[in-house]
């Protein structure tokens, strides 16, 4: 597991958080299925556990602050991201245990982590979510987030 602090979090985080809140407010979430991520008309997806994916494949959107982050990530850990999204957890929402075996590396980056937010569980180990911090790990590892006790836990996720 690798942990890194992103030096430009103050530029990126407010943008991603507002974008995600707007996506959730102004669209109807689709249930998770194979083609949903690549359908241009789909803006949000509900995952098992009821958390909401937004900003689907944001690494391909040509947003300056986002591109800066993904370039930094590639230089820092040598991963070319193939899929990305932002996931928002409100009270009572979670992400069930899963893994991404089709990718060598998975990462989670803290955008908004209110006091009392659930940690990321990676293969049974508790990893506290921290604003501005990337946690990268093998896509082979099972991970989950237990039911949130607060609104607004928001992270950027990607795989490569």
For each feature predicted by the language model, list its residue ranges.
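Catalytic core of non-heme Fe(II) oxygenases with the double-stranded beta-helix
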Residues: 78-147, 151-159
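Non-heme Fe(II)/2-oxoglutarate
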Residues: 1-77
